[in-house]
Amino acid sequence: MKLAYWMYAGPAHIGTLRVASSFKNVHAIMHAPLGDDYFNVMRSMLERERDFTPVTASIVDRHVLARGSQEKVVDNIMRKDKEECPDLIVLTPTCTSSILQEDLQNFVDRASISVNSDVILADVNHYRVNELQAADRTLEQIVRYYLDKARRQGKLNQSITDVPSANIIGIFTLGFHNQHDCRELKRLLKDLGIKINQVIPEGGFVEDLEKLPKAWFNLIPYREVGLMTAIYLEKEFGMPYVSITPMGIADIVQCIRQIQKRVNTWTHFLLNQKLDYELYIDQQTRFISQAAWFSRSIDCQNLTGKKAVVFGDATHASSMTKILAQEMGIRVSCAGTYCKHDAEWFEEQVQGFCDEILITDDHTQVGDTIARIEPSAIFGTQMERHIGKRLDIPCGVISSPVHIQNFPLGYRPFLGYEGTNQIADLVYNSFTLGMEDHLLEIFGGHDTKEVITKSLSTDNDLTWNSESQLELNKIPGFVRGKIKRNTERFARQNGITGITVEVMYAAKEALNA
């Protein structure tokens, strides 16, 4: 457990709740004290959905501490079963309630006898794993539970579909542009003649999980969630998977070729033919995606050699690093991730594409690195956006955790060919470019001497003495800039070159007159 005012990945129970609330007709019960139950508020605020968050908090209070939790937890499970009639109820403790060392599995077993829903306890060590690892583990646990159940009941049909099909695994609630990415992946697979078998967990039903083995292969767009499930399905049912994230032209090509390889394993026998996607890749790269020609344009060449820092989850940070270095000629001074559990893979991916690698979940270390490097732009999470504002460095957000502005209503995927256009726009708009650079250097803004920047003065003919600077600093930040501009404007109009406290008050009086 760690006390911090900013965490890149939250506690384990948040990951479990994200997976549970992504499925349709699944209810989660969180065994937690007040304070750990913020998930409902967070999801309701951020996700653009009309449905209520299907999570109930079974609060650990003084009565529970005195008598134990069994009665309360079992009552909550039975009540929710009666009210909501869910297919599955997932019970999860939090790292705080885990301190009580109660046998929650026993509570689940007892409740299961009296309810119609399936009930499982999230099999997660809340002290050892973070939000993303817990989400990955919970998804695998739910998939395993329902496939084992179907096998026991003799309902498991392992015959594959007549036409090429895929499962998309790892799209879930509160993910970074996940809904948009999912639409783009569906479009990509449709173009390749591949049917969607299942998308899990987002929008899926647990009763349909028994159909997962019917697909020809599994597509895992994000390493953080879905990989454990794919490995389990490969081991148990021999299902191949593709885990190359189709983000950026080069990786989209690699992903499509990997899909072609997986599909041709079966088409050779079932359809007596082999599929070739090279023409599709060529058409999309040259004529559909704007990013390929944009990266060769004079606009993009202005970015060549500019420094950038990239930080985020392993999937997005590694892909973004390769896009900047390979496709846009931007120098990535530092690439980093907060996914310490996936450090080895991340280092392998970005090796040779950046000057240094940073593996940390400490935001102060990231801030210090950015301040030391002084890049032209940052590509990171919401925290890097805050750091950028403090250091006056533009920041493009490319990874969770994010705030409301990165849950857009419009269509903004980061994956697939449309995703390449979005990324090109984001990169280009994040840098201060061309003539803008010169104007800022010469005038501190546009071509007028009347513009005042954040520094104390843009002109050498105006100087603030120590008393006036001290007085200015006493003024609250949200109006300080306005007062400074008004004072300097008054000084220029009256031919004053040295600003004193008296000048400040004279400017105030003149403005109020």
Curated annotation (Swiss-Prot):
Main location: plastid
Residue sites binding substrate per the record: 434-435
CC cofactor note: Binds 1 [4Fe-4S] cluster per heterodimer. The cluster is bound at the heterodimer interface by residues from both subunits.
Compartments, as annotated in UniProt: Plastid, Chloroplast
InterPro entries named in the record: ChlB/BchB/BchZ (IPR050152), LI-POR_suB-like_C (IPR013580), Nase/OxRdtase_comp1 (IPR000510), P-CP_red_C (IPR042298), Protochl_reductB (IPR005969), Protochlorophyllide_Rdtase (IPR016209)
Keywords tagged on the record: 4Fe-4S, ATP-binding, Chlorophyll biosynthesis, Chloroplast, Iron, Iron-sulfur, Metal-binding, Nucleotide-binding, Oxidoreductase, Photosynthesis, Plastid
The EC number(s) this enzyme carries: 1.3.7.7
Primary enzyme class: oxidoreductase
Summary of subunit composition and partner proteins: Protochlorophyllide reductase is composed of three subunits; ChlL, ChlN and ChlB. Forms a heterotetramer of two ChlB and two ChlN subunits.
HAMAP family named in the record: ChlB_BchB
Protein name per Swiss-Prot or TrEMBL: Light-independent protochlorophyllide reductase subunit B
Organism: Anthoceros angustus (Hornwort)
